[in-house]
């Protein structure tokens, strides 16, 4: 841990006097704070604490060679209700009894997220950071973050994006993945109206349209020397097409609210790619 970010630190409650060597750090108190110390140990093992450590350690830059426990222990802790303390104590006892992490991990993370009052969007940010971003930063180009997402993942992303678009009150939207080709994926957001969409007569934008604008740039998009993630936002009549590489890292559900804001901005400014010009 002291040389680079190998894994997340862990916290344990020790119910007796102890001394610590270099590499260990402790919070100590008398027996009157026994319950609170146990609860704090649970909080420090939660996804929120891991997110805090990942975001504050800044261990990916060349300027940092060592990590310190105090960065992890600096996590601000809000007041705990008696009910929350009881929930955390139950988790600590179950873990101390040797139960598998899978049996208590979800309850721990949910309880601590409630303690901090995280919104659903904020919880998704934490989840994406500890899965997709953590994998990406740790494993580089070999990370599963650069693999193609399954269809059900795009369905979840599309549902989140549609929710944020509808909340903008600029019409009701249908959102779906409409194309996956040439190493890209295209998410289409279409405003509902009284006229039914007709694929045979309505304009159809495709990933090929975008690529054909400048075929010479394709080599740079798929460079083997670095990771390139180009994207395009195309206004096409009543539809908006969001095009990115077909990689998990490019379609994190936690970014769907920002994507909705970018779509709204494009609608306001009227930056449009004309399909007829692209075809030419």
Each predicted region: which residue ranges?
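Short, ligand-facing micro-motifs at secondary-structure edges
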Residues: 3-20, 38, 42, 49-63, ...
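Active-site proximal loops enriched in glycine and acidic residues that flank catalytic Cys/His/Asp
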Residues: 3-5, 28-31, 44, 76-79, ...
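Extended hydrophobic-aromatic, low-complexity segments
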Residues: 9-13, 35-39, 51-55, 83-87, ...
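Basic, amphipathic alpha-helical recognition segments used for DNA target recognition
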Residues: 22-74, 81-84, 251-280
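Non-catalytic DNA-recognition/assembly elements of restriction-modification systems
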Residues: 78-280
